[in-house]
Amino acid sequence: MTLRSCETFLRRSLRFSTALNLTAFPEHEQLYLRVSSGCSVFRPQTVRKCLFHWTPACTVSQGVFLDRLQKGAAVTDESLCNQPVSVSPDRAQQFSLLMKDPDQPENAKSLKVAIVGSPNAGKSTLTNQLLGRKLFAVSSKVHTTRSRAVGVLTENDTQIVLLDTPGLTTQIKAKRHQLENSLLVDPFKSLKEADLVVVLVDVSDKWTRSKLSYEVLKCLALNPDVPAVLVLNKVDLLKNKALLLDITAQLTEGMVNGKKIRIHGASKPVRKAAAGANSRLKEKKAAGSLEDEADHEDKLKALKSHGGWPHFKDVFMLSSIDHEDVETLKRYLFVAAKPCQWQYHSEVLTDQSPEDVCFNTIREKLLQNLPKEVPYTMTQEIEVWKESEDGVLDISIKLYVQKETHMKMVIGPGGQLITRINQEAGNDLMKIFLCNVRLKISVKLRK
């Protein structure tokens, strides 16, 4: 199916084989979804008798789409991953596991997925949901993820490698905010390695939801041979659900999987893709036009006039409160996996060291609790990392701040804030390492 709204929308609808020719009576047209694969979906509670036909284009009926989207019940089960894998708190053991030869099954399949998008689109949250546990730091502030990290999801004979990338930003912003070079280069490197690209868009952000950034389009254009899917995130936070139809049309430029989509009820016309620019980009292999990014900046500039990408293979819509939507995307990834040797042993959950996991977890709490630039200026240092005689992992972290005012902010009145940060970070680390953790965070002014 070319447009995959989400499992929540379709789970109570009838589904027919693509070999059937289906249609419904014209007076019930608002009750079903027509897609390019040649099947129709309608609500059996309302329509009892129908005739059928095939339709060559993807048409989304606004009535049934909004009805199912608004009535979908929230699912709170977080068990998306069946394996209770943990990250080893011992650096040597974690490194040894990463170096261990994969335990290849007989019919091994694999898929490497790069998750890209603008800062704060929800990339790390989605990665955590797919893995079935919280592993990567998330916060409401931008640039929570500072460098690429790998999450590994292994089930039966299939391994999905998730590349969680920093939010795409510009060189000007990186220089202005003194951001690490990894925020600029890691997303592009990830796409070169990927078998599939997931472009994540936060539809609750009215400033960015209707247009893909130049950086996202540039990533896609430089890797036209890598299949890409569009994921609209946080759809439950969008009050006017009818806007989802317009957003889909704008971000795909009216094309999904090589076919035009028609959306009933869309209030804005879909801008046609600039054929010249896209054809030049697709001729990359023949002309070698994009092998050297610097030499072909003029062609990439043509992307600035675009708001969408007409080469998405599929479209998903995710709710932050309904995990069935994530489960649908997860199943899609497993189906898309190809016969290929595994890259990691089945016990590997991430390529991060336990120290990096700890630093990122604490940093998440600092970002959540401190204002403006304060958490971005802090550095961490490990003082103690050892297992005590009672089997508890003792971790002592020294937090360095640049100003005395920042120190007062971190400590909080009566030490309440640093105590809360310590407790929350410690609880998260216990869930990641699957062992008791005794965390101690102290604050010091860097001179």
From Swiss-Prot:
Residues 109-340 form the Era-type G domain. One of its GO terms (molecular function) is rRNA binding. InterPro entries: G_ERA_dom, GTP-bd, GTPase_Era-like, KH_dom-like_a/b, KH_dom_type_2, KH_sf_prok-type, P-loop_NTPase, Small_GTP-bd. It is a peripheral membrane protein. Residues 164-167 are annotated as: G3. GO terms for biological process: ribosomal small subunit assembly. Keywords: GTP-binding, Membrane, Mitochondrion, Mitochondrion inner membrane, Nucleotide-binding, Ribosome biogenesis, RNA-binding, rRNA-binding, Transit peptide. It comes from the Eukaryota. Residues 143-147 are annotated as: G2. GO terms for cellular component: mitochondrial inner membrane; mitochondrial matrix. Residues 233-236 are annotated as: G4. Residues 117-124 are annotated as: G1. GTP binds at residues 117-124, 164-168, 233-236. Belongs to the TRAFAC class TrmE-Era-EngA-EngB-Septin-like GTPase superfamily. Era GTPase family. Probable GTPase that plays a role in the mitochondrial ribosomal small subunit assembly. Specifically binds the 12S mitochondrial rRNA (12S mt-rRNA) to a 33 nucleotide section delineating the 3' terminal stem-loop region. May act as a chaperone that protects the 12S mt-rRNA on the 28S mitoribosomal subunit during ribosomal small subunit assembly. NCBIfam families: small_GTP (TIGR00231). This is GTPase Era, mitochondrial. The gene is eral1.
